[in-house]
Swiss-Prot record:
Plasma. A proteinase activates the inhibitor by specific proteolysis in the bait region, which, by an unknown mechanism leads to reaction at the cysteinyl-glutamyl internal thiol ester site and to a conformational change, whereby the proteinase is trapped and/or covalently bound to the inhibitor. This is Murinoglobulin-1. Residues 686-745 are annotated as: Bait region. It comes from Rattus norvegicus. The keyword Acetylation does not apply. Pfam families: A2M, A2M_BRD, A2M_recep, MG2, MG3, MG4, TED_complement. SMART domains: A2M, A2M_N_2, A2M_recep, Thiol-ester_cl. Induction: Expression level in the liver as well as protein level in plasma down-regulated by up to 70% during acute inflammation or tumor development.
Amino acid sequence: MKKNREAQLCLFSALLAFLPFASLLNGNSKYMVLVPSQLYTETPEKICLHLYHLNETVTVTASLISQRGTRKLFDELVVDKDLFHCLSFTIPRLPSSEEEESLDINIEGAKHKFSERRVVLVKNKESVVFVQTDKPVYKPGQSVKFRVVSMDKNLHPLNELFPLAYIEDPKMNRIMQWQDIKTENGLKQLSFSLSAEPIQGPYKIVILKQSGVKEEHSFTVMEFVLPRFGVDVKVPNAISVYDEIINVTACAIYTYGKPVPGHVKISLCHGNPSFSSETKSACKEEDSELDNNGCSTQEVNITEFQLKENYLKMHQAFHVNATVTEEGTGSEFSGSGRIEVERTRNKFLFLKADSHFRHGIPFFVKIRLVDIKGDPIPNEQVFIKAQEAGYTNATTTDQHGLAKFSIDTSSISGYSLNIKVYHKEESSCIHSSCTAERHAEEHHTAYAVYSLSKSYIYLDTEAGVLPCNQIHTVQAHFILKGQVLGVLPQIVFHYLVMAQGSILQTGNHTHQVEPGVSQVQGNFALEIPVEFSMVPVAKMLIYTILPDGEVIADSVTFQVEKCLRNKVHLSFSPSQSLPASQTHMRVTASPQSLCGLRAVDQSVLLLKPEAELSPSLIYDLPGMQDSNFIPSSYHPFEDEYDCLMYQPRDTEELTYSVPYGREKDVYRYVRDMGLTAFTNLKIKHPTYCYEMNMVVLSAPAVESELSPRGGEFEMMPLGVNKSPLPKEPPRKDPPPKDPVIETIRNYFPETWIWDLVTVNSSGVTEVEMTVPDTITEWKAGALCLSNDTGLGLSSVATLQAFQPFFVELTMPYSVIRGEAFMLKATVMNYLPTSLPMAVQLEASPDFTAVPVGNDQDSYCLGANGRHTSSWLVTPKSLGNVNFSVSVEAQQSPELCGSQVATVPETGRKDTVVKVLIVEPEGIKKEHTFSSLLCASDAELSETLSLLLPPTVVKDSARAHFSVMGDILSSAIKNTQNLIQMPYGCGEQNMVLFAPNIYVLKYLNETQQLTEKIKSKALGYLRAGYQRELNYKHKDGSYSAFGDHNGQGQGNTWLTAFVLKSFAQARAFIFIDESHITDAFTWLSKQQKDSGCFRSSGSLFNNAMKGGVDDEITLSAYITMALLESSLPDTDPVVSKALGCLEASWETIEQGRNGSFVYTKTLMAYAFALAGNQEKRNEILKSLDKEAIREDNSIHWERPQKPTKSEGYLYTPQASSAEVEMSAYVVLARLTAQPAPSPEDLALSMGTIKWLTKQQNSHGGFSSTQDTVVALDALSKYGAATFSKSQKTPLVTIQSSGSFSQKFQVDNSNRLLLQQVSLPDIPGNYTVSVSGEGCVYAQTTLRYNMPLEKQQPAFALKVQTVPLTCNNPKGQNSFQISLEISYTGSRPASNMVIADVKMLSGFIPLKPTVKKLERLEHVSRTEVTTNNVLLYLDQVTNQTLSFSFIIQQDIPVKNLQPAIVKVYDYYETDEVAFAEYSSPCSSDKQNV
């Protein structure tokens, strides 16, 4: 029953369509309303009304219907009999980003009514947003600078508020965010510093709009060395299988434009290089030297690849790789190319061939014959066949390889037109696997346009890409048939132009009709202004209405030049400058434009090419893309094609049937324009109902209507500005000669310019800038935004920073006193003439230098030549020694080469300064003497004796005295250098993080926080936050060395530490809340029913094992961390944890108190945080009995602490655990509720005095945890006792001799670290304090000691392989082997660091060091400038063996031994030293 009703409706609909004058209105009244199928809010939109043969006044109403109600768009009274008119309307913003709504069109008169409803998509107007970074790739520790650009679809700037912007690392951690950022005049610049050890890989900048839409931009973080030159491989785009030779050219050019001397290896492989080894073996290699232009061209014979004998090989490309090795340095860089393989020697390109044909209108074809390189082939005969039209023709290509054809379509009876063009004879091949020779041949199929009356119109355009602001002419060809034409005096053709989904232009053309004719044929021209609003694609629809209601139409798509209204130009004058010279940058744009400038070293773009910011890129942004909306099939009033249940008997009505999906009727023309039609006119081609049921998904896809006539065959590069750059202004006469201009180069940025400037009212801004010292080419561009003309982009401007000649120094990073090394100065002359040169090493009392060989101070350097001068240098002073080498071109009447040299006017002298570190021999020692001195009315003094051991290394002793007015002055100055130890694991990284929280809190509470200190501390917090995320596991936990690809186990203690630190840092920086939640969730899963926490992961600090057992000590620490994270004691996890501690305290009370000191200090602080004063007091009372009181100070020690070695000249610094315990007691006392009592403060002061004596010279302590906890205690004590006194203490230090220095401390310089060097070592000094107030005095003594035999806590053996010299010229590379075991008092050590210092002039072979991380006990390796660090999770009495290779970088004479140090990270007194020498160090070396 249902099927019968559907069939009746289908038949009724189809009959209506074929009744000549049938409509819902009487007579001949016709209606067509065209509206974009996709409408935008807050944007003027148009609806076009076409009312035809009205016989009464009507009202036209348009309304949008949604779930929220009905919104009337307009209500128009129409009195004209014929009307073509477009009305504007605006839709208010939607609550959601888009929604499908119903558009109702009602046309109502006194007698008749027409009403129709269709679905349209309404979308909120979205801004166009993109992000520009200052460069595409960053090194760890660098600053990421970026700007957010916001515009409307017309590219005018917007002041847009973005609720959120953030940066995601490769693990999708949100590492930085900004809230409520607003662009001003369309621009907002932000920056963010990467940590020193970020996760490497792709990062994302995400900008969140208020609509919820996200815009993203990617950049890369990786370690890299900028390439000094690029390699360009030039190969043909394609070859034919009949070619026997391929010419491959490889050129290597320095970034400053000069050729590279060296060697090139060219590899040519056929097939996919990622396939099997069989495919990979199909390669040829050619080696050659680069010529004077830095190039090498090779003719590679490819006959052995047998391309034409094997069908499969005919379709595989060649891959070319060229690796250039620079002469002298051995630096290698590569370039690549790809060569396609074609079956024919030439091919056809269809430049014009429409996808559809129209009966009676000629079908135009334009082709181009090109060779395998793409070059046109003139004067060649080409053939064309169109069998359905009975058309065969031949012609000769013109000088451009073009041929044109016009095919008469009148005789075509079917629905398709198959065109074949070919060159020479037709191919004899039938199967695709045929290997016989083929000639160019192409096919094109066009399908019929449907018209019931066989009437058509065709828009013909020859254009490729239309230039903006010009008139484009379109030819219209038409043929109209039908008896009803005779009653019309004229035919009116209407057209409209659309772009970006909106109707932009409308117009019409009238053609007079002679009375009584049954066919009208002709053509006319339409002139279309090409406006900016039409970029990048415009579509034009033309149609006319025949008297019987049939609509005849055609459309065409134009590619429009991607132009911008704001014309921007950036230039440098001069375009080539010396490093460090001044250059003039000029930017022109629309007046009052805000311009973002950028200039990047070309080396960066060689390393990581990026898409150039161009009009093409702008118009390809998501916000600029336009798409047609086709309603979903479930909408009941979106009718399908009309269908007939039977074939009409009138064969004149339907003489053919085009397959469904390929016919082109008016409905599809309208739909493909992006329009929805409301009409009672005939615009659809009916189809038999059974045909529609036979439609299958495998039918060929409908061809896109978005391409120009000829579809894919008329492709041209878009957005490329081919206009020449403006000529530089004429050069002025050279100025009078100045004294020799000397260049000293030391500034080498990767991004030179990153600024915002405003163009003045004349449209110009000019800036004087200093060129960096890098010898390279700078790539610069400007992005400008104007309220009047919108966005403008400059083309890339280049500035070549170049020097006619320059000098480069080769020297080691450091040497040990007594060693000698070769200092080499290489001078490169890039002038086309020879120059007399003078090279000079500036004399210094810090070293002696002897020229090597026959080198002269002056010599003649040939054109494009290089020369190296050498000196054998022996440093005489310790510390940093400067080496300054100058090279100068000198005027001389004598011949240089074969001519008298001409000295350049600029750049006649180049100077390079490098620093060498000269270290004393032996082992470094440091002692710090700290005191908290509080004076009242009477003067307070103490004596200080600086003693040196008898074996001290000569001249290595140095000392300084520091005075601070604040308890945290030293730590504030050195927050990133608190301890002189590596920071390579997750726990150690936190010493770079947590102290900044305490410093900020303390300074904020005491009102001493300055913007400078705040900025520095926040930067350190952000960097530490990034680094710590490297050590996060997927389950939310953290461990010392991270996930290790899912194999590592989270560490309970470290996770708690990170949790509390991140929670406290939230007050100062952005911390992604998910990291805190994840850590807490993971910790809660580790809690047992008893409330205690089970241990996960290794405890790398054995002090945690010193209490009752691991579980209680660990539980106390975690409870403390949870409470410091602002969790209330009522939280279920915290409440259970406190229950665990209470039960554990009862056990401890019954035991032997002395063995639980560490655990009790943690518990005291945990109960204090929970507000349980009773338990806090009980534990503190117990601890008071175990306190060690000496010299008016109080501290605690572990009974089982390691024994100190005998023979110390000074009392050694307390170990990490003792500092921790004492600091926890202070924290417990200061956390008393509601406030610490005078007794708490007094007792705390005694411990604070002891703690300050343990501080090192940087304000930290012996290790990481003690530094974090002690600084927390110091900051809380400082805040509790802080007062701004009106009286100022005066500190005096004087020696037993004549030395004396005074320091005044007041409120203005409390945080200032005042320091003076002490002249007499050894010597006796007196420190006195007068006035009133407390000061912190610290003396630091450093010296070196020769390596002595001792009884260390580690057995350490170091040797080289080979042991002895087996090369009379010296050992350039050898292996270092280490054997380590623990011999201390405990079963095993804590985490251990093995620090291997490099011999002077040697560097480690990094892959051999990295390979050690595969060993079981090696958690991490680091290669620093002069050291190799091995992180060992622990060491027992079992010997561990490691080895790696080092190689000579710079020859050094009289090589001194290098030191290897192995130490416990948390018990730094447990240390062992050894030394090693080069196998050839005892022999004379040729350096």
